[in-house]
């Protein structure tokens, strides 16, 4: 939303992306409050915003950035000035080397992926995570629901059990089940994670709660979000909590 009376659009080159830094600063103040009062880390999702000209500003109000491809991981390293938290549904022999060169954390979508590439990541000192499917998502359209029956996005608790549990070398769990969602949806997601994966939470170092947190919306209850995250941290004090709002 732009206040047109303050912008002379005739002087703006077209096509272009136009960003109102005042609105961005307002949103970042909300993010800062959540980081400060909840103790959770907030990292920037490049799939939602890859405008590298504002990376210096975003870097001052975040704890890093997340990538979903080799190109995004390279952009984080080169323009954000630090290695990326990387997750992609698929890694290949052709791109895994570049991705690892640009990453500090990498999340694997399956146990098979970790068996294939995990040793390479661990040898480089990269923190490895596993995407899990907590069997809950508020997304109503099956096409976009990552937890729909038959989903290949993440590992279910039953799959972990049949494969002998969480493998050595996995330091984090990652779920991504929200989309423009409220704090009450995150609460239900965390309840599902504790119900299905609670036995592993005190064995790992970090829990990435993915994106879809609409925390800068006027109707979003940030007080509830902060209380929810603090309560979860109190139950699992060893865990680093990570959010990836777009």
Residue ranges and their predicted role:
Residues 1-18:
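Generic N-terminal amphipathic, Lys/Arg-enriched alpha-helix
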Residues 2, 26-30, 35-36, 41-49:
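N-terminal glycine-rich anion-binding loops that anchor highly charged ligand groups
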Residues 11-15, 177-181, 213:
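Short coil/turn segments at secondary-structure junctions
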Residues 13, 20, 182-189, 221, ...:
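Residue-level preference for long, well-ordered alpha-helices that form the structural scaffold
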Residues 23:
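Active-site anion-handling motifs in enzyme catalytic cores
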Residues 40-206, 228-235:
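Active-site-proximal beta-alpha core segment in soluble small-molecule metabolic enzymes
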Residues 209:
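Structured binding elements
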Residues 212-246:
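Anionic-ligand-binding alpha/beta catalytic cores of soluble enzymes and soluble regulatory domains
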């Amino acid at each position: 939303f732009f206040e047109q009376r303050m912008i002379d659009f005739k002087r703006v080159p077209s096509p272009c992306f136009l960003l109102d830094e005042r609105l961005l600063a307002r949103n970042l103040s909300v993010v800062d409050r959540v980081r400060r009062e909840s103790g959770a880390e907030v990292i920037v999702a490049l799939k939602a915003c890859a405008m590298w000209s504002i990376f210096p500003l975003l870097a001052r109000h975040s704890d890093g950035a997340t990538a979903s491809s080799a190109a995004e991981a390279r952009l984080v390293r080169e323009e954000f000035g630090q290695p990326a938290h990387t997750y992609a549904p698929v890694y290949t022999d052709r791109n895994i080397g570049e991705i690892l060169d640009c990453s500090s954390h990498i999340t694997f979508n399956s146990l098979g992926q970790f068996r294939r590439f995990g040793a390479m990541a661990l040898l480089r000192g990269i923190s490895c995570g596993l995407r899990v499917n907590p069997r809950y998502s508020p997304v109503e359209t099956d096409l976009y629901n990552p937890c729909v029956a038959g989903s290949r996005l993440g590992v279910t608790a039953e799959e972990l059990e049949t494969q002998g549990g969480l493998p050595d070398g996995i330091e984090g769990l990652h779920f991504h089940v929200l989309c423009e969602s409220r704090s009450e949806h995150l609460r239900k997601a965390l309840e599902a994670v504790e119900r299905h994966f609670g036995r592993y939470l005190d064995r790992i170092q970090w829990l990435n709660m993915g994106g879809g947190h609409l925390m800068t919306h006027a109707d979003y209850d940030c007080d509830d979000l902060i209380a929810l995250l603090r309560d979860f941290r109190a139950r699992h004090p060893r865990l680093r909590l990570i959010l990836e709002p777009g």
